[in-house]
Amino acid sequence: TLTHPNLKHGTWCVRHMEGGNKGTLVVPEVCNIFVDRYVVPGEDEKTCIQQMLDAARALGLEEKVEVRLKPRNSPYMQSFALEPDDGLVTTLQRAFKEVTGEELPVEYDPSVCDSNILAVSLGIPTVTFGPSGGGMHAANEYGHAWQVKNCAEVYRRTVAELLK
């Protein structure tokens, strides 16, 4: 995979593998593998397909391997990264310091979410920022009340500054 100075490198995760007959010790004629691929900037679905085909060729399996994408109705998620000196980043950091008195570090997260669509597909600079809490992505997800209040003020100040 390609590398990125902050996001490091893409990842490969085998989500599902199926082949052969249950309970028998035979080499299956067909094996289907579902691979989830996290990419870094500069990689896309075409890059991933080529990397898999290159790996098959290196193993002498190019005639036995078929690579295809899982169909979807929306674009495949592409990676993005804002520079630490991007106006959105520095404005958010300034507002955070004004509200909390603390520095807001820039961190990079090797994951995908709706921000990928905003940043890549729509060209809207995007950061992920919010309160700490627990139960992430579950029915009991919560944010600490004092952080929710602080975040609301940070959002307000950031938007006000960006709209000047």
PLM region spans:
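Metal-dependent amide/peptide-bond hydrolase catalytic core
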Residues: 1-164
